[in-house]
Structures are given as structure tokens and as C-alpha cells.
Amino acid sequence: MKHLTPPEASAFLHANPDAVLIDCRSEMEYLFVGHPVGSHHVSWNDGPDWMINPHFVGQVQKIASVNRPVVIICRSGQRSVDAGLALEKAGFDAVYNVLEGFEGPLDEQHQRSKVSGWRFHGLPWEQC
């Protein structure tokens, strides 16, 4: 698995139109916190029990074949590593993790999107 900063991931997606951006956060994060424009939502895990989604790989396969590059993003770049490893194990050979994620880590005031992440870098995003 390769790792890209949010600006690198955005540039990669623009340069590779066959690449797919998968947002693996929970449904509530995706809908209410926001998500990168053009991303596909497939939860790695979700509430209320936060169990790993047993259909994750199959759901991603419906969106992208194992031959297409898959860029995967979560909140801060942790869940996306686990999700990316599952995709590699299933035969995906071009998996890219977005370092920093959509919101990045907490700052000194315990707020996200103030230090790093997709939103911090001013990349295109939307909310539902």
C-alpha cells in the first residue's frame, strides 16, 4: 500500500480518471461531517456496534475492479490502513491510503480539521 497526503491524493485522482476514491468512515461521518467530492461511501465499520463490515471488500469490488487504483480515506488515516490491507489481501494491487484522512488529528483545543486533513488543505468536499 502506498500513502499519499491529501494534496497528493487529489492530484493522483485528477491524473488517473480510472482511480476510485472510497470513503470508509461511518455513514454519519460521511453524511454530516462531509466527504470529498466524488467519493464513494463504503463503511469499514459503523455504529452502533462498530463491527468490521464483512461485506466491505465485496462492496468495493462492485465499484472498482481489482485492476483499478483505489484511494481510500477515513477520518485521520487509521481505519483506511486496515481497510486498504483487506483490499490488498483480496487482490487489489493499487491501493493508496490518504494520510491525515478527511479531518486529521485533534489540535490543542481538541478540534479536527485545524492541523491537517482533506478539509484543512482546502480540497473539494461537500455535506448532505
How should each PLM-predicted stretch be described?
Residues 23, 77:
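Conserved G/P- and acidic residue-centered "switch" motifs that form tight phosphate/ATP-binding loops
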Residues 72-73:
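Short, surface-exposed ligand- or partner-binding patches at beta-edge/loop junctions that are enriched
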